[in-house]
Amino acid sequence: MKQHLWPLFLEAIKRDVVPALGCTEPISVALAAAIAIGELGIKNQASNVKMDVSVSANLMKNGMGVGIPGTGMVGLPIAAAIGAVAGDSNAGLEVLKNLTDSDVQAAKLMLDNGQVTVGVADVANVLYAKVTVYYQQQTASVTIADSHTKVIAIEKNGEQCLPAPEVESVNDKSNKANPFTEARLQDIYDFAMHAPLDDIGFIMQSKSLNDALSIEGLSGHYGLKIGATLVKNQEKGLLSGGLLTEVLARTAGASDARMDGAMMPAMSNSGSGNQGIAATMPVVACAEFLKSSETQTIRALMLSHLTAIYIKSYQNKLSALCGATTAAMGSAAGITYLLDGEIEQVSAAICSMIGDVSGVICDGAKTACAMKVSSSAGAAVKSALMAIDGIRVTGTEGIVADDVDQTISNLATLANGAMTQTDVQILEIMMHK
């Protein structure tokens, strides 16, 4: 076992599995706005500023149609406005945790008065947001790039102001050693199975946060009400009970609430709340259905989240490939373990997942993401059950190879290569429909 990687795995988990209030792409805009207001020291006058927001094409795609927590609205303009009015610049991905009804009204008035403009920047960065604030004779601009809380530039009245705020060092450790350049899935599995429970027990926080979101979503007041619809039709007798229905409903419920702007944080994975949900809730629902022990649940969640990060490490931060599908591959691993599978079966489940849901597009963050999240959760259950029975998509089929790590690499080649043009086409359709 490569135990020298274990401290790095822990760092990766603590960096990439963190609470996030609201979809992380518009939240990065809100954070930049909050920091810019702080630079000018005009918190009490924030509703009187004008703002220019410039974002990468990918961030525009993921910010156009998603609910902003506590506002009842969607999109980047309200994210920028509410970030300026109510944002906590030291709270990272929970920048909007303290907003009030009066803050929301002030932010909406800013939009009504045309104080916020949003456009697409011609930049190489896949994840990029620059917010420039104008107040009387003063200006401040904040640029976030490459990671949702990574502040790369702050400018006040034409002068560079560095170093960046502490939020960067707290939430982004991208300069740290990357354990995944050396790691293989076997190493992820060994860590999840054998690391001391005292070192990894914190992963149960993902269960607490995302299960609370699920319960809220199942109330039937959010988004497309996918989770609530599944529960209702189970009660009608149109759907049977059992593991699959439980996983689908619990997972969809969390995503319903998340994508419709519930004022509750999700435990994210790789910078995405939906990916955190997809890596958490199928495992949680399965563990409860099987009456698994707390120890088993901890190890299954750690296997799921770290596998999701490992798979994502091969890919660009944002792409045309739906991140919920790759995160749910982590859940396939965790569920397989809960069903008494070992590394051979875990590998088989991931290969089958890639044979099933590879190529599902990301056409922006929105309430309909809950459909893709629940579909991916269903694929995770299906692949795990197949693996336990010794069945998998084989290395002669499509992009799936005999070796699981090669299969993961093949998926990344698809996402980082040919699907870049897919991304361009998706945004073009979205902007002109």
Swiss-Prot record:
One of its GO terms (biological process) is L-cysteine catabolic process to pyruvate. It comes from the Bacteria. This is UPF0597 protein Spea_0809. It holds the Pfam family SDH_alpha. PANTHER family: UPF0597 PROTEIN YHAM. GO terms for molecular function: L-cysteine desulfhydrase activity. InterPro entries: Ser_deHydtase-like_asu, UPF0597. Belongs to the UPF0597 family. It comes from Shewanella pealeana (strain ATCC 700345 / ANG-SQ1).
